[in-house]
Amino acid sequence: MRTLLAALHCPKGDVAGNLAAHLRLLTGAATAGCALAVFPEMSLTGSVDPATHPERLIGLDHPAVAALAEATGETGVGACFGIAERSRAHEPHITQVFAASGQLIGAQRKRHLGEGEEAFTAATHTVVFGHRGVTFGVAICAEAGLDQPFDAAASGGAELMLFPAAPGLYGRRTSEDSWRKGFAWWEGSALGDARRQARRLGLWIGLAGQAGATADEDFPGLAALVGPDGGVAARLPDWRPGVLTVDIPLAGSGVVSVP
């Protein structure tokens, strides 16, 4: 399954601008022959702290969510994208949405919150999705360090895990050296977790992370594909925004990074 993994710059609170970026990448994914596009954690809203900016939370019925879902029908590319969600019960969740064929298919809310995410509400349920004959689950950022999200998805038949992330770096990145150091930390953490989980369960894992500087926080990027043997099959080289297009051969015929 040809897949676009996006390391995307996602300004906080700029839903309209982020939607435009998603739509451009979805169109590009269609041109490249992709069946699926994977965007980072909270990609549509940008990273949100509900304690300080509750107005930046959006519902699953928000017009931008509907517009992106509609675009999956127009392009023929399924999209897994992130929002900071206000649920119908008015609870704040970190949520990864999956849309395909012009419809909102479902959503995976984050079950295990990371440091600094205490203002969000943790979910309890695991969702397994199907697309183009491929069954997949989602582990959101800090969840990749825990076995439970992967075990639950694998028990539901998942052969692919999507790993969207938005790990805010401590301290601002003011030089290339400081960006390099922040990226080195995330590279070791994210790929270390992905490689361990892939080997343990024989899964493909696709990573897509927020990249670049926002108003008050910086993100280390990285898009990568890890194979069932734990090897890094393809990846972006550094912290800068970019896209990685890969063929994920779930029938077992090898993997290529597509220029």
Model-assigned labels for residue ranges:
Residues A7-H9, P40, R109, G209:
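Residue-level recognition of beta-strand->loop/alpha-helix junctions
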Residues N18, A29-R56, A79-C80, E143, ...:
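Active-site beta-strand/loop signature of hydrolases that rely on acidic residues for catalysis
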Residues F81-R86:
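Short beta-strand-to-loop element that shapes/binds the nucleotide-sugar donor at the catalytic cleft/hinge
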Residues L60, S87-E176, G182-G192, W239, ...:
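Active-site catalytic loop in hydrolytic enzyme cores
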Residues A20-T31, A152:
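Short, well-structured alpha-helical segments in soluble
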Residues A7-R24:
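N-terminal phosphate-binding loop and adjacent alpha-helix
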Residues L60, A64-C80, G145-P241:
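CN hydrolase (nitrilase-like) catalytic-core segments centered on the catalytic cysteine
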Residues M1-L5:
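Extreme N-terminal starter segment of soluble prokaryotic enzymes
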